């Protein structure tokens, strides 16, 4: 993978306090203090650096009316990934070729990712696969042009098996070539539904554990699509993970699974930035491994997410929320202990309604926002500093004209 040069940041080398930063939370069966400390060690030193890869991908599942809030209409969602990536790369104060699609509420999580990436001093690398629109900025192309998005998962034939295999191998080669830790981020409208589909295809019962970009996830609609896809795919018992992806998945998944397996073979730790889509990737990787090797692999992996997603559907009596239940469900299914970490960033005191909407359950996560905010905290940023920077970025965004 290409080396990622640093850009100017507010990070000052030093020795951050041990343990998680203020307001950050660990969750999952692997959330022991010893496991947290072991995992955090390679990420605390800002001088070591890490690779940040954002994968953009497309699926026709996103065009189903009501399935996603990553764009107010199905037409708008075709361009969400490219617009989000351009915001991450260029920032809110420079003209961009792709306007952010209108959302029912909130603002793109790419704004949070941009702020955190600037603080850390990391320059993202963007990869694209299966998009309707080719990104108008330098990016890593993972397959020949013209392949297009995956078909809707309800067809039971989302992609050809040969395409899945090729993307898996492409990701594996990239991961195996890593020489430093990897933060993997994604932007895949409709991706929480394909995540639910592949997890179900692997044999897990997760229908009530999958979130999404909408304030109220369309659980009935999601399950209807999954049921139709499973019926047509006829996967049977214990299907191979590549077959599951081909039937029900999206192009991001085979790339990400390959990357994960390759990175761990190279001995590099990986932070999966997101929620259920990253949990699905981890489950697919575990399904491809011998049981005796699974815990060794996940010992170097953590899920990094936002507080809004980590606390979603958390019971008033303190019982775990949906995401924690999901990673524990996957961990129990494959006999491993998984660790999740959530940033402490909140927007209750933001100056902007679009950011305050996150506190109401809109958007929640995406483009690696939670993982990058967490890493910014690990390298010295306070929640107040990140909030102020996000407010400033919103001010810039509202004053930006588009070319």
Curated annotation (Swiss-Prot):
Protein family according to the UniProt entry: Belongs to the UPF0284 family.
Tell me which InterPro entries the record gives.
Nict_dMeBzImd_PRibTrfase, Nict_dMeBzImd_PRibTrfase_arc, Nict_dMeBzImd_PRibTrfase_sf
NCBIfam families reported for this sequence: PRK04447.1-2
Q: Which domain of life is it from?
A: Bacteria
From the Swiss-Prot or TrEMBL record, give the protein name. Answer: UPF0284 protein PMT_1350
Q: What molecular function does GO assign, one term?
A: nicotinate-nucleotide-dimethylbenzimidazole phosphoribosyltransferase activity
Give the species this sequence originates from: Prochlorococcus marinus (strain MIT 9313)
């Amino acid at each position: 993978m290409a080396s990622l040069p640093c850009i100017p940041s507010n990070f000052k080398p030093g020795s951050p306090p041990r343990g998680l930063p203020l307001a950050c939370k660990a969750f999952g069966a692997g959330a022991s203090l010893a496991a947290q400390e072991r995992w955090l060690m390679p990420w605390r030193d800002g001088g070591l650096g890490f690779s940040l890869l954002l994968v953009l991908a497309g699926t026709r599942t996103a065009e189903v009316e009501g399935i996603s809030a990553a764009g107010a209409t199905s037409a708008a969602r075709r361009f969400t990934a490219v617009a989000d990536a351009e915001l991450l790369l260029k920032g809110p104060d420079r003209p961009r070729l792709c306007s952010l699609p209108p959302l029912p509420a909130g603002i793109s999580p790419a704004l949070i990712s941009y702020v955190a990436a600037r603080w850390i001093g990391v320059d993202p690398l963007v990869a694209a696969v299966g998009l309707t629109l080719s990104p108008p900025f330098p990016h890593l192309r993972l397959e020949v042009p013209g392949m297009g998005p995956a078909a809707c998962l309800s067809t039971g034939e989302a992609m050809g098996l040969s395409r899945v295999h090729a993307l898996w191998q492409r990701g594996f080669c990239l991961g195996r070539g890593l020489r430093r830790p990897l933060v993997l981020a994604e932007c895949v409208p409709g991706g929480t539904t394909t995540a639910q589909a592949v997890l179900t295809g692997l044999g897990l019962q997760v229908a009530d554990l999958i979130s999404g970009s909408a304030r109220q996830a369309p659980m009935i609609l999601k399950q209807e699509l999954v049921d139709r896809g499973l019926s047509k795919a006829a996967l049977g018992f214990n299907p191979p993970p590549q077959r599951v992806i081909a039937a029900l998945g999206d192009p991001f998944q085979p790339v990400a699974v390959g990357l994960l397996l390759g990175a761990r073979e190279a001995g590099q730790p990986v932070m999966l930035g997101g929620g259920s889509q990253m949990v699905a990737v981890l489950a697919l990787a575990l399904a491809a491994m011998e049981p005796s090797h699974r815990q060794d692999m996940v010992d170097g992996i953590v899920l990094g997410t936002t507080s809004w997603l980590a606390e979603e559907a958390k019971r008033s009596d303190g019982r775990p929320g949906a995401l924690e239940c999901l990673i524990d469900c996957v961990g129990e299914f494959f006999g491993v202990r998984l660790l999740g970490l959530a940033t402490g960033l909140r927007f209750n005191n933001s100056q902007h309604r679009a950011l305050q909407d996150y506190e109401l359950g809109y958007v929640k996560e995406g483009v690696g926002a939670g993982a990058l905010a967490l890493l910014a905290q690990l390298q010295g940023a306070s929640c107040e500093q990140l909030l102020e920077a996000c407010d400033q970025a919103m001010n810039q965004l509202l004053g930006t004209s588009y070319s």
